[in-house]
């Protein structure tokens, strides 16, 4: 296994560990999710380049679109919660339920 794949797997694992440990704030959770998506994007790009299959080159672009949508929704939720409560705690998300 190449060293770059090991580095990407370590980056994904560290982001996942950060998401599990620092889940009290919305901003830290969003940053960990972005790190995971970045690792998946680089990994899928490398796999698509190594496969040399033309249709596989669309997979990283689709993943990037989903990452952008996730970031936009997460930031809008962060702005809404911080404007309403003045804090970015995940515990405030339970108050949004009807």
Swiss-Prot record:
It is a multi-pass membrane protein. Signal peptide: none annotated. GO terms for biological process: ATP synthesis coupled electron transport. It comes from the Eukaryota. Keywords: Electron transport, Membrane, Mitochondrion, Mitochondrion inner membrane, NAD, Respiratory chain, Translocase, Transmembrane, Transmembrane helix, Transport, Ubiquinone. GO terms for molecular function: NADH dehydrogenase (ubiquinone) activity. It is an enzyme of class 7 (translocase). One of its GO terms (cellular component) is mitochondrial inner membrane. Its main location: mitochondrion. It is found in: Mitochondrion inner membrane. Coiled coil: none annotated. The chain crosses the membrane at residues 1-21, 29-49, 61-81. It catalyses: a ubiquinone + NADH + 5 H(+)(in) = a ubiquinol + NAD(+) + 4 H(+)(out). Its EC number is 7.1.1.2. PANTHER family: NADH-UBIQUINONE OXIDOREDUCTASE CHAIN 4L, NADH-UBIQUINONE OXIDOREDUCTASE SUBUNIT ND4L. Belongs to the complex I subunit 4L family. Core subunit of respiratory chain NADH dehydrogenase (Complex I) which is composed of 45 different subunits. Core subunit of the mitochondrial membrane respiratory chain NADH dehydrogenase (Complex I) which catalyzes electron transfer from NADH through the respiratory chain, using ubiquinone as an electron acceptor. Part of the enzyme membrane arm which is embedded in the lipid bilayer and involved in proton translocation. This is NADH-ubiquinone oxidoreductase chain 4L. It comes from Procavia capensis. The lineage of its organism: Eukaryota, Metazoa, Chordata, Craniata, Vertebrata. The gene is MT-ND4L.
